[in-house]
Amino acid sequence: MPLNEIVGVIGNLISNGYIKKQSVIDALMTVPRHKFIPKSMEEYAYIDSPLGIGYGQTISAIHMVGIMCEELDLDVGQNVLEVGTGSGYHAAVVSEIVGESGNVTTIERIPELFEKSKQVLLELGYENVEVVLGDGTKGYLENSPYDRIYVTASGPDVPKALFEQLNDGGIILAPVGSHFQTLMRYKKIHGKIFEEKLLEVAFVPLIGENGF
C-alpha cells in the first residue's frame, strides 16, 4: 500500500473533522483499498472519491466510509450486518474495528461482486467476515441479532426486517431517499426507534423486495 498517499488522505480527514476515533483511523490506515478495485483503477485508489467497480456500483469515498464507521460507534466484539457488499472494502474496515472477537455479515445481490469480494476478503485474511449472496433488504436472520447494521445504498425507507434483527441498544445507519438522500441514524432503545438526520449524501439505489 502506498503509505504516503493514505497518510495524506487520512490526515486531511482528521483535519476536516471527518474522523476522530483512533480505531477508525487505524482501520483506514490498515485496509489496502487498491485491492478492492479493478486493476485499471488502482492509480486512483487513494484519491478520496467514489470509484466505479462495475455493474452500476461504486466503492464509497474514503471519507464516507470513515464517517459511517464513526457514526456507527463501532467497538471490539460487536456483531455487524452490512447491506450491500460492493467491493468488500467497507466490510474490511469494519472488520478491523470489531476485531477477531467481532463478526461482520455482508450481503450482496450481484453474483459477480459477491464472488469477487468474497475472494479478496479471504485472500486478505478477513476470517470474521461472512459474505452472503442475497437480498439485503430482508436482512440476514441466521446471524442476527446485530449490534450494528449499516446500508450502503439508498432506499425509500429502512426495511422493517432490519429493525427486527437489531439488538436493543443497537444502531442502524442508512441513506434514505431517491434523488435527494439523507444519511439517517436510528437507535433502538427499549424496543422504540429514535432517529437522527446526519447529512446529505449520494448513494446508488437500494434494490430488493423492500427497496426500490
From Swiss-Prot:
> Where is the major localization of this protein?
cytoplasm
Q: Which UniProt keywords apply?
A: Cytoplasm, Methyltransferase, S-adenosyl-L-methionine, Transferase
The record's annotation in CDD domains points to: AdoMet_MTases (cd02440)
Supply one GO molecular-function term. protein-L-isoaspartate (D-aspartate) O-methyltransferase activity
Q: Which GO terms describe its cellular component?
A: cytoplasm
Active-site residues annotated for this sequence: S60
* Ion transport in keyword set: no
Cellular location(s): Cytoplasm
UniProt keyword ATP-binding, yes or no: no
InterPro entries from the UniProt entry: PCMT (IPR000682), SAM-dependent_MTases_sf (IPR029063)
What's the catalysed reaction?
Answer: [protein]-L-isoaspartate + S-adenosyl-L-methionine = [protein]-L-isoaspartate alpha-methyl ester + S-adenosyl-L-homocysteine
EC number(s): the record gives 2.1.1.77
Which GO terms of type biological process are on file? methylation; protein modification process; protein repair
* Entry-linked HAMAP family: PIMT
So what family is this one in? Belongs to the methyltransferase superfamily. L-isoaspartyl/D-aspartyl protein methyltransferase family.
Question: So what does this one do?
Answer: Catalyzes the methyl esterification of L-isoaspartyl residues in peptides and proteins that result from spontaneous decomposition of normal L-aspartyl and L-asparaginyl residues. It plays a role in the repair and/or degradation of damaged proteins.
What is the protein's name according to its record? Protein-L-isoaspartate O-methyltransferase
